[in-house]
Amino acid sequence: MSSESSAEKGPPPSPAENVQPGVPPAAEEPGMISVDIAGLFYQFSKTFILIFPVYVLGYFGLSFSWLLIALVLLLWWRRNKGNKNSRLYRALAFLENEEKSVKHHIASTDLPAWVHFPDIERAEWLNKTVKHMWPYICQFIEKLFRETIEPAVRGANAHLSTFNFTKIDMGSQPLRINGVKVYTENVDKRQIILDLQISFVGETEIDLEVKRYFCRAGVKSIQLHGTMRVILEPLIGDVPIVGALSIFFLRKPLLEINWTGLTNMLDMPGLNGLSDTIILDIISNYLVLPNRITVPLVSDVQIAQLRFPIPKGVLRIHFLEAQDLMWKDTYMKGLVKGKSDPYGVVRLGNQVFQSKVIKENLNPKWNEVYEALVHEHPGQELEIELFDEDTDKDDFLGSLLIDLVEVEKERVVDEWFSLDEATSGKLHLKLEWLTPNSTTDNLDQVLKSIKADKDQANDGLSSALLILYLDSARSLPNNPLEINHDGMKKAAVEKAKKAGKKIGSSPNPYVLFSVGHAVQESKVKYKTAEPLWEQTFTFFVHNPKRQDLEVEVKDENHQSSMGNLKIPLSQILASEDLTMNQRFHLNNSGPNTSLKMKIALRILHVDKPVRSPDEQHTSQVKRPSIFKGKQPPTPQMPSPSPAVAHKPPPTPKLETNKKPENGNKGTPPSASPKSPTELHQSSSSLSGSSFTYSPSHLPAKEPTPSIASDISLPVATQELRERLRQLQNGTTLGQSPLGQIQLTIRHSSQRNKLMVVVHSCRNLIAFSETGSDPYVRIYLLPDKRRSGRRKTHVYKKTLNPIYDQTFEFSVSLPELQRRTLDIAVKHSGGFLSRDKGLLGKLLLELNTEDAAKGWTQWYDLTEDGTRPAVSS
């Protein structure tokens, strides 16, 4: 058989099969020698490239450390590059087959939002539509780059006159929408609010070059993930029904870029994070709150109001103190525990505040105040992170996420919050929701409350909010010498002359605004005397009766002033609706030069919380802050003692990272209204579940009930019945012979967790002559593993313990109807004690509709928990 036919039919036979008897083996083909030579040359070249830098260092007498530094940078760069590529390929694989990825147990962080949150819809029809439109979207993007961005870059600088895009390819993978959420509560009737969970993972290729300098650069892949809000408003009674479309990101999206060419240096260590941050800042200037893109669909819509609406409110954050923070600094290689140098980072949308650093303190006190604008709610959340300052990398101490809907509802929240993602630690915050009012009725009261003095500077707490919309300018002078010289700085003109700039060229105007010490600057508009800005600016005002708004138009090209203006804020106070919308003539400028602006002043005031009649009783159910020391003695009787009655009512507890709920409207049908006495005794509300006590948060030395006590449940039940017969001894026991337990139960669809708040117990039976040492143990059946067990602290020698502890179970709302809460009140006899027993049980079936709304109620304890009678 010939070699050609054997190659066609299959793999070549082995040498033994190929050699015929009496025929010497064929000589080796000459081609094999050339392959060896090529491999040898490749190996020699590789070795030479590795050794040559060492020779160069020795030849020039340089230090060997330069080679080590270069090697470290190369390895670090390759590692970062590999991580980026792996994330890109993983995301691409997930987008190609989402269902298969889910079945193969992909990491939960990579799953789309609709998997975690039931209120977010998958909307696959939208992805199919985008996929069909993607080629035409790519054509639009390419047209935008070539006809808009490319000419703008060329005109920005003479050195970039040969700039052009050589290739623009957005890739075949379209933008994907992982979930859509439509808001139906707490929104205006004339608007529709949608949140889109967008994800773009594309092999995008954008190449550019500057021919004059033989410079080539580009991008070969982009990843973008974030939550984009789309607002359709106002709804009108005519076609097209929607007046305008507003698009923006609620917070900075996640961005990752792989560079090519000259820009590949941006992937080097130290520059990779910086480059992404700069690009994110550019995106934030256009698409992250308070900035937005507004597309008018009808001509008579007030675009200025839609693009830059007045903020919904101002959040005053009192960043007070923390307790029991984790220790991160160690000595003698961890043998000696040190302390931490904590500081906090507070984020609200695009606004970031950082506290001072408290050295070597696990119970720091900052006592700092920040004021942040709230532009959109629901949707915006207050994010707080605590760090331990170190010389190399700051250590994480815990975080906190607070839904602002609850803060707006309560107006003032002064509370201790347990830190998430931390084994210990709690943070004391006071949050005030300030409502912008268009009247001066409360101005004197507000000025008195913040102790506003005669100081012109904007240093103290704010009494008002100044919102300024800069529209355009008219008839700006082209020649600085045309301006009134009394208002000119001669040095500025001389500087422009020395710089060789043409005096009569078109200006590059921008505007400076200042109120007190706060200064803000508009964008620069190039080569125009009729600029159009359409920008908004917001200032916090300490005392509007005494402060002024100073405006100055400057020319970046000539480094000179083109006119100025001063507006006393008291003039705005005298205007109708505290608003001025007009053209303002500029001083020290041309005769017809003017600025078109809309200026609004809003008085910041803490309004009283407004609750519906159904929510009036829930507002009284409050819970005190965490005590610094031991729990104070609890009363032995359920009726309130005088010491309790005259205590000032504590502020309401606020749940972190939860959706707006409807108070206690979801009380089960069998639940009856609580009496005023019970309301006074209750120490926690439905909205109060930010104290999340997971097993990792509990003290390590807390006594743990025996596992055998759960296994031998029939024995414990029999002993409890025997104890009841002994207590009865011929007498008639009351309606609740084993006592009662008060619980709050609610399912958070946003966090996908069931939250159970154990408030207190009353009238428990005495396990011994000295009383009982009760604690509460909880299972979410059928899960009875040790990891699924939750338990409260133990309180000694009391029959009326007050716990006020919150426990969380990860369970979806549809699955909840198949689960049962197993709650047992037990006596803890101490470590290794045999005096442990059951004080009462409660088995509670969970209804999905009721759990979504939540309720707070007293329940009777029974021997086996099969009769969960609801107390009136």
Curated annotation (Swiss-Prot):
Please name the SUPFAM superfamilies in this protein's record: C2 domain (Calcium/lipid-binding domain, CaLB) (SSF49562)
List the protein's name. Answer: Extended synaptotagmin-2-A
One cellular component GO annotation, for this chain's record? cytoplasmic side of plasma membrane
List ligand-binding residues for Ca(2+) 1.
K328, D329, D388, D390, D395
Asked whether the keyword Metal-binding is assigned, the reply is yes
Sorted keywords for this record are: Calcium, Cell membrane, Endocytosis, Endoplasmic reticulum, Lipid transport, Lipid-binding, Membrane, Metal-binding, Repeat, Transmembrane, Transmembrane helix, Transport
Q: Where is the composition biased (Pro residues)?
A: 632-652
Specify where it is mainly localized. membrane
Q: How does it sit in the membrane?
A: Peripheral membrane protein; Multi-pass membrane protein
Q: What is the lineage of its organism?
A: Eukaryota, Metazoa, Chordata, Craniata, Vertebrata
| Annotated residues for binding of Ca(2+) 2 | D329, D341, D388, E389, D390
Write out the residues that bind Ca(2+) 3: D390, D392, D394
Q: Tell me a GO biological process for this protein.
A: endocytosis
Domain C2 residues, every copy: 297-417, 442-588, 737-859
Domain SMP-LTD stretches: 119-298
Q: Which gene encodes it?
A: esyt2-a
Write out the ranges of the annotated region (Disordered).
1-25, 608-711
Q: Which residues lie on this side of the membrane: Lumenal?
A: 53-55
Identify the residue ranges that face the Cytoplasmic compartment according to the record. 1-31, 77-872
Compositional bias of type Low complexity: which residue ranges?
Answer: 682-696
From which organism does this entry originate? Xenopus laevis
